[in-house]
Amino acid sequence: MNSVLRYSRSKNLKLIWNFTLLFVSLQVINDSNMEEVHNSAQLIELIDRIGFLPLLDSGIHGFSAEDIVAADCRYVVFPEGGWDWPLWKWKGSIITEGHHVYGKFFAGKAGFISREWWPDFCNYRRNKHPEPDEGSIEEAILLTLAEQGSLITRELRALCGFTGPKMRSKFDGYVTRLQMATRIVTEDFVYPIDRHNNEYGWGWSLLTTPEQLYGRDANLCNRTPEESFARICAHMHTVCPYATDAQIQKMLR
């Protein structure tokens, strides 16, 4: 009998918690004036308005592109095989047509930043992560990109000499840290083509530096790094009024 009661209580608590998360997610969307998104044009407009948007889970319930898009735009696996994920396919057009910045900026996870907010974000992050040391692997990666212009990840990895076993994840770690430092961004996504001339697969990130993609002036900011960070945090509280200081700072740091 006691075990049945414990199971029932546990199940009820789980249901309450799930409803709480759903309520918070809806509140984040409603209080931020964020309507459900059905296409890339709407998502471009939303990023223009709110400035920052992680692609997937941000640690703030309801605040990600995956949370905001309509159900038929999310990841689905078909019973007969194959998959579809409209949101994933929009990333390239959001960068190239919406001119938003994309990379692993939020606690090592991918997301979008509007060009309006990029100077403040870049100002804060580059102060926190100074230029790589001379002779370091990070410097070699940036010099290779400066020389080549833009490269998909596997090409960049090969040119930097990371060709041995277990080198892929190690190299990806360096690239992620450089994205967190706003030294590398994604220019577009490149997809393999099948024999029917159709794109397929997850695609490869075409990496470059923000200076090459947007010009050096795009990074300039007339505030101190501390002022930029305070400005971003204050703005995020208007976008996500139900988020705590700790949640926002964890996402941004």
Indicate residue ranges for each PLM-predicted region:
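Accessible peptide chain termini
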Residues: 1-3, 34
